[in-house]
Amino acid sequence: RDPMKELADECRKQGLKFGFYYSLGRDWEDPDVPTNWPTKAGRSNTWDFPDEDNKNLQAYIDRKVLPQLTELLTNYGEIAMMWFDTPEMVTKEQSRSIRRLIERLQPHCLINSRIGNGLGDYRIIEQKLMNEIDPKPWEACLTMGANWGYNKYDTVYKKPDMMIRNLTDVVSKGGN
């Protein structure tokens, strides 16, 4: 069973575009993902893979990221968007190689700015609102509560009128 294939097929059946989220720098099960110590300490798995000096982000990209992206971009039909996250230590050349792969396999796929190094098609603004209209494409990335993902113990949520105000503010300034 392939849940992503089922989801992609159902999205198309319902007239929705389909895309993927991909975290470039948060793979806790890979020995080559560095933490960017001391700036971003604790962002990778130093318990199982403590040798920060020998971690090799390029090896991780070549061995895991590019093959996974190839799978995502070739097995699920047309991909409308790749929504990347956490590119803190990705070099410009690494971002370029990822972008080239996407352009070759899915030439119409949108790529957000979190591919890193200014190579996205549009900018992500996280947990804040713009102060003025921005003519360049951008997206506000705002949570509805206190967490990025589901937490059954979460009890802090923005009130509906606040979420409507935020959405109105974003759209009025040209954002998504």
Feature map (PLM): residue ranges:
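Mature catalytic domains of secreted/periplasmic carbohydrate-active enzymes
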Residues: 1-176
